[in-house]
């Protein structure tokens, strides 16, 4: 049996750090961002739909101009919804195929690293969900420092995602990432013990 652990959080909460720690332990990661990049780079049907919807200039020599596309959809809910309608079904199909392969190979634990896990309803295909949490003021401070953003711009980015507190309340496992790296590692160890207990893995 394969246990699928969904991993999500908010921007600048430390989800990527947790994902890297899991990968270092040899746990396979299905990375939603990587899958999305592969779909944009390699799927000609998706590229054609992006050109038809947003303009021919967004695909040059078989490559999507991701920076231009990002600028176009950021802060524009209608454009973002159009892009998601084009890409989300293909991304989901790719992720589901990877999950089927993991099951076929009897991989005991696979992590689905998905920034929009709840927004796109992947919790329905996960056996458990881990949320990396920060109170919004700490999240804001980290994002402003990391990306050199104004408070207003950082808040816009945070508010473009679903409420982190809501995600935390829905999760099976929560890491509160306000402390040190060692504290983060200790919490992750506890989560993995909980996953082993729930899944029957030793």
From Swiss-Prot:
Its main location: cytoplasm. Transmembrane segments: none annotated. Keywords: ATP-binding, Coenzyme A biosynthesis, Cytoplasm, Kinase, Nucleotide-binding, Transferase. InterPro entries: Depp_CoAkinase, P-loop_NTPase. Residues 4-202 form the DPCK domain. Pfam families: CoaE. It comes from the Bacteria. Belongs to the CoaE family. PANTHER family: BIFUNCTIONAL COENZYME A SYNTHASE-RELATED, DEPHOSPHO-COA KINASE-RELATED. It comes from Latilactobacillus sakei subsp. sakei (strain 23K). It is an enzyme of class 2 (transferase). The keyword Transferase applies. GO terms for molecular function: ATP binding; dephospho-CoA kinase activity. CDD domains: DPCK. It catalyses: 3'-dephospho-CoA + ATP = ADP + CoA + H(+). This is Dephospho-CoA kinase. Catalyzes the phosphorylation of the 3'-hydroxyl group of dephosphocoenzyme A to form coenzyme A. NCBIfam families: dephospho-CoA kinase. ATP binds at residues 12-17. One of its GO terms (biological process) is coenzyme A biosynthetic process. Its EC number is 2.7.1.24. One of its GO terms (cellular component) is cytoplasm. It is found in: Cytoplasm. Pathway: Cofactor biosynthesis; coenzyme A biosynthesis; CoA from (R)-pantothenate: step 5/5. The keyword Cytoplasm applies.
